[in-house]
Amino acid sequence: MTAAHFMTDPQAMRDMARKFDMHAQNVRDESHKMFMSSMDIAGAGWSGTAQLTSHDTMGQINQAFRHIVTLLQDVRDQLGTAADRYEHQEENSRKILSGS
């Protein structure tokens, strides 16, 4: 599919929006697993500053993944809005051209 076709095909936009939503869900799920598994690594030799540093680093990484999820969801929403807007404009153009 060419970019020009994509930008004039509301269904293709919605299909792509669903893909972005799936990617957002995958990133969210996998980052949650990663964060939770990092909380379980503390042991007898893993405490104090090392543990605090690890938890701080993992918190920052988790925050970065949340930002990625937000970006993916924003793209999803914008594609859906663009598809609706294009369909509405297309319908208005048809009415104008048909004289209704």
Curated annotation (Swiss-Prot):
It comes from Mycobacterium leprae (strain TN). The lineage of its organism: Bacteria, Bacillati, Actinomycetota, Actinomycetes, Mycobacteriales. It holds the Pfam family WXG100. Belongs to the WXG100 family. This is Putative ESAT-6-like protein Y. Gene3D superfamilies: ESAT-6-like (1.10.287.1060). It comes from the Bacteria.
